[in-house]
Each structure stands twice: as C-alpha cells, then as structure tokens.
Amino acid sequence: MSEWTVNEDGRVIVRVLVRGLVHVAREEIAGAETSVRRARLEGDSSAPGSIRQLRIAIRRIEYQLATMADVDSSLDIDDLVKGLHEVGKPFGQLRDAEILSARVAKVLRARGVTPESDRLLEAVADEHYRAQRASDGWLDSEEFHRTLEDLNEFRLTLPTDAVTPTMARPIAQHAIRVTWRSVKRAAKLAKEESRDELLHALRRKVKHAVYLTRGFSYVLGPSSEEFALRLVTLQKLLGRQHDHVVVAAWLQGIGGDYASLKPLTDDVSLEERRRADHGAEEWAEPWQFVRDFRPKETVMTSYSFFD
C-alpha cells in the first residue's frame, strides 16, 4: 500500500489517469480480438501475433490497475484485477506451450531424429493443441466477455475531466515510486535466495513497472522511456530463465507419464535446468543497469497531492 493518503484533488487525477489507461486497454483488446476472429474466418486458427497482442493488453491493464489501487485504495478494484488475471491465464498457457514447442524442437534438431524424439515432438504438439483449443474456447466464453464488460463499466464510473501533464505528474511519479519499491523488494528477496519462484516474482514486478512507466510516458517525459528500456532488458533475461524452468518441469512430467521417453526427457530436462541455473546467475548486471539510471528523480519524485 501507499505510505501517503491521496487527497481529494489527487483522487480525481488518479481516476482521470486510470480512465486513460483503461481506454487504451479497451482499444488494444478490441483490436486484437477482432484480428483473432478474422484470422479464424480465414482459416488461421492460431493467429499467434494477435493472440500475443491480446495476452499482453490484458496483462498490462491488470498490472496497471493493481498498482494504481496501491496508490489509491479507494478505487476498490480488487475483484476487477482478479477477473483480468483469470481472463489472461489461458493465453499465458498458450504462450508457454509455444515456448515449449520452440525449445524442444530446437534441442531435438541438434540431437538428430530418433523414434523417441518423434514421439516427444508429438507429445509437445498435443500440448500445444490443447492450449490452442482452450484459448479459442475462452474467447467465446461468458467469463471472458463479462470481464471485459466489467472493465468498460468501471471506465464509465471514472471522471472525464481533462488534466494537463503538469497536473498529473505528481500522481504518475508516485505511482512509479510505488511499483519501483515493489521491484526493489522482490530483487532483495531474489538476491538473498535465488529460487525460481522468487526470480519469477521479480520478473512480474519488473513487468508491472514497465507497463506503468510506459502507460504514463506522456506525463513523465522522455526519460521514462529510458527507464522502461532498462527494465525491459532485465525482464527479458528473467523471462528466458523462466522459460527454461517451465520447459524443464514439463519434460520431467512427460517423462513420468511415458516410461519409454524418460531417458530422453531426463537428459533434455537437465539441459534446460542448467540453462535456467545459468540465467539465475546472470541478472545482477542488468539489475545494476536499472539501478544506475540517474533521472529516476524526474520519473518518480513528487508528493504534492499526498497528505
């Protein structure tokens, strides 16, 4: 939670800023959804680019709203944030299946074709097919459309006042401070004990910071994009580490289900585990790169609207 209480003027500006974030999200989600449905009609059931845009748009507004609720708890949007999280899950699972397909195919190509590798590729294809079907079905689900309706209804409760960047900057700066503090806490935990789940939590907090910083770039000015780019460098490294973790875990599971594949899956899983461990040792440098960013004061500092 925020360590300051937002005063009445500040609450109005919070809501104006949030309305802008929601407006952008609705446009992005609607555009991506339209592209996915058009691709379906044209016979392309996967539409990976549009699905990716849809997944990112949903996750971005979820993270942005979660942080703004920390800035001003009177927004009372916990249920909406939870709904957006659930709505995004099938698309995240499809993304994991796509990463799995690409990683396993790459590793097996280097090893050469065997009956076991062919069977493993079939299992990977089955996993991807199930994830694809689940995301397709989710697009037509009542839950998906109800959550998007809830998002729009929330938007309609927000003020339509116009505010200048100068008026909005103190609130935007404080929002970035809130998410930056959560990033630093997550990094401290990950440095103390470099477990997969702590690195994953850090990656999520970094994404919170990226999405919010870019969402308010028109208020914060050009230095905010440099800050976001540094965060993205860290996010991508942590993302690759997490991908190796996911692939290694899946291979262990499938090896338990198919005894004939276990020698191969154990071997490939070990390779992925080593890559994950290597990634877990590499994040200190990009983290320092983020911490060395000097114009943070212009991105984060100001308390004018806080009591």
Language-model-detected regions and their locations in the chain:
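Cationic, histidine-enriched alpha-helical/coil surfaces that engage anionic ligands
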Residues: M1-D307
